[in-house]
Amino acid sequence: MSEMKETTTTTVEHEYGGAEIQVLEGLEAVRKRPGMYIGSTSESGLHHLVYEIVDNSIDEALAGYCDEITVTINEGDTITVTDNGRGIPVDIQPQTGLPALEVVFTVLHAGGKFGGGGYKVSGGLHGVGASVVNALSEWLVVQVHKNGKIHQMKFARGNIVESMHIVGDTDRTGTEVTFKPDSEMFDTTVYSYDIIHTRMQQQAFLNAGLKICTFDRRAGREQQHEMCYEGGIREYAVWLNQNKTPIQEDVIYVSGHRDDASVEIAIQYNDGYNENIVSFANDVRTPEGGMHEEGFKRALTTVLNAYGKKTGIIKGDDKVSGEDCREGITAVISVKLTDAQFEGQTKAKLGNAYIRTLVTSVMNEQLDVYLEENPKVARAVLDKAMMANRAREAARKARESVRRKTGLESGQMPDKLQDCNERDASLCELYIVEGDSAAGSAIQGRDSRFQAILAMWGKMLNVEKARADKIYGNDKLYPLIVALGAGIGEEFDINKLRYHKIIIMSDADVDGAHIRTLLLTFFFRYMRPLIEHGYIYSAVPPLYKLTRGKTVRVAYSDAERDAVSAQMRGDNPNARVDISRFKGLGEMDPHELWETTMDPERRSLRRITLEDAVAADQIFTILMGEEVEPRKAWIEHNAKYADNLDF
């Protein structure tokens, strides 16, 4: 590939002292309403504490002062984050007359991120990190190596236990923070090494040359990783495609900057049918995209069409759409900018309009040059886009053909759907039921006011290996598309969705699990907003029926079976309790199905969530793709976590 202009980190020529720490407001109500600051008090919020501290170290790296970060899970699930940056300022902060270190850890919205002097670029938009972690920790200790001395402070639930004092000499610079999450504030205080490692690996990819080490020091769980990627996001794109078949060896790389903003983009196509665009602003993941993604998509479509016309690959008035151009693409977009405008505290979408112009300009200039200098890659990409275009047209014809053949016009619903009476989508549930027998029982046992039933039968299509035209022509999936009413792919409109609870109800066996995985793959690839908005659920049917006399109970696991059996025997351990295993949903009569699996007052449902789209993309590729060995390795590694798997 041709040499492209690299994005470099410019060192801020400015003394980083207490005067750079600006106080916007005092630390208030974090412990009363932690969700406002870290999203939730679940496992997600627990790990967010780690990210808040690490983000401060990343900011030092972005400014050019830090090249090594270490994150350690200690025995007892305490966390230590260490960096070799300049160290948090320890001199007096002018506004408060207090040591800057104390201000950073005790005052909300205090940090070197607001005035433009401390950091030009920062991912910590709101500057709440250190103080919020402090407020939500049972205890926290910070040590700053600066000016030849080690400065230390200790806190308990946000309150100062030890004021800043010197505990020793040092020949290095940097900050070390150790904290223990407060069990009074979180649902769990047990950390997942995999979650932390995944996040740190992502940061290492985004900051070329930055070394990040992760350690798990807990007894019986010891492991460690060292990550440093000189190729930065180019290596990230290759890593994202590791279980796919690339159609190009090289990674297309473009970069540029204007004023205080910079952009770098890495692109590698694979022979699959799905697009995987991962975007970041100041190293913060933007899962809902924003202006940088808009600029990228617009420029990609424009450049590929212009090159195709110029070379004659695209004939006459033909053109390829944006969706065609992005079939099989893996792209990493990373922008760095001052005064980043994110939508919401979760920073899910970038709003700076000028970034769209910058990204479009860089793509227009450099992608065109790359295509000119690499005609074989250009041809492969355009051939794929043209094939996608033909498939999209075939999908349109297939959609119309199926509608004509099945009479699914003018709002007519599929034969396999038994709809509910309610028309308010927020009150409606759709049960997707495996097999006609179980569907029949579900139809008889349901509450027809708000519960609809759609029967699924036969072998389902694996959408991981199929284009949209095959999906529209599939007699199993098309009725589901029509029943939901929101379309698929780029046509998907969540506002047209007819049900806000979509419940997969399949048997608790291998076949049932396979059907669930096929459906989840379909939803993830073609209706992802359903998962993102929390509309997809999995029913949890009972495994056992226990009977003693006229008393009948059900159990959802082996452990519950044993516990219920003991309860039913009571004081008589020899009492007879008949235990039978449900072989399938079809074995239950309508009353049993209602009581155990469909009654909102008694049923058990699992909401399918999407914590990390990148991880989910890889999991579905491994589970449903062509390669056997990665699938086998993944199953073997995760078998012990089977009860906790979540996409």
Regions found by a protein language model. Give the residues of each.
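Short adenine-binding "F-helix/F-box" segment of the Bergerat
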Residues: Q93-P94, L101
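Conserved short strand/loop->alpha-helix "switch" segment adjacent to the catalytic nucleotide/phosphoryl-transfer site
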Residues: K32-Y51
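GHKL-family ATPase ATP-binding module
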Residues: M1-A19, L27, L49-Y51, D59-A61, ...
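Helical (often loop-to-helix) elements that flank the catalytic cores of nucleotide-handling enzymes
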Residues: P94, Q341-I355, V554-E560, V564, ...
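A short glycine-centered beta->alpha linker in the GHKL/HATPase_c
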Residues: G87-I92
